[in-house]
């Protein structure tokens, strides 16, 4: 069963800031596009198997069910709501 994937406005802002930094500060628009493509692909893949990535090492965050996926040089942090069959992307750092 597929889960719904939701991205918080904070995480969305994080993703756009990272892409803007790569495109405008590092002057590499291709790398920025690659980051956005990789983020879309990896985050979308969570819908089919959300538990495939581990909990964070921090015991407090792990107790909240915070997991992470590595996307290029960034981490996307997310939680799983089993009751609502949804995944919430909370940050992208």
What are these model-predicted stretches?
Residues 41-52, 75, 83-86:
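Short, charged/polar surface micro-motifs in flexible loops or helix N-caps
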Residues 8-10, 49, 90-92:
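Generic beta-structure capping elements
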Residues 26, 71-93:
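Enriched for short, Lys/Arg-rich terminal
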Residues 43-69:
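A short, surface-exposed loop/turn module that caps and links secondary-structure elements
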Residues 4, 68, 77:
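Short aromatic/hydrophobic contact patches that present stacked aromatics
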Residues 1-38:
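Arg/Lys-rich, positively charged N-terminal/basic patches that mediate binding to nucleic acids
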Residues 34, 54-57, 87:
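Short, hydrophobic secondary-structure boundary micro-motifs
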């Amino acid at each position: 069963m597929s889960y719904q994937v939701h991205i918080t406005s904070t995480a969305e802002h994080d993703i756009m800031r990272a892409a803007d930094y790569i495109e405008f500060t590092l002057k590499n628009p291709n790398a920025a596009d690659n980051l956005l493509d990789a983020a879309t692909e990896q985050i979308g893949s969570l819908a089919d198997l959300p538990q495939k990535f581990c909990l964070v090492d921090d015991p407090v965050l792990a107790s909240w069910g915070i997991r992470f996926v590595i996307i290029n040089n960034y981490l996307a942090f997310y939680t799983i709501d089993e009751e609502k069959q949804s995944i919430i992307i909370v940050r992208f750092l």
